Amino acid sequence: NTYPPYNISKIDDSTYRISIALAGFETNDIDIILEKDILTIKSSGKKKNISENFLYKGIAFRAFEKKFQLADNIKIKEATLKNGLLNIDLLKILPKEVKKEIINIIEK
């Protein structure tokens, strides 16, 4: 399923972005759900405006569901909708340095 189109980009060493083209959608038309390590972006479609009389209708407002599997060390930083583009910024949490522990040997 290729609708809606999306990109995944690397912003820097610890930040990634999923960008989804959602022209005409508003924030209340979109659900973003994180359950365990599965990120789901979905919509039941935009409410139809009966008063509009299209001569040509090329912008789709249909229902969709996109799922992305995230690694354990990926957290969602924020989601923004601007100019028809939904951006979900992901933050890669780097594991803390493992402390070196010296074990003393006891002579018996």
Identify the residue ranges that each predicted region occupies.
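Alpha-crystallin/small heat shock protein
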Residues: 1-108
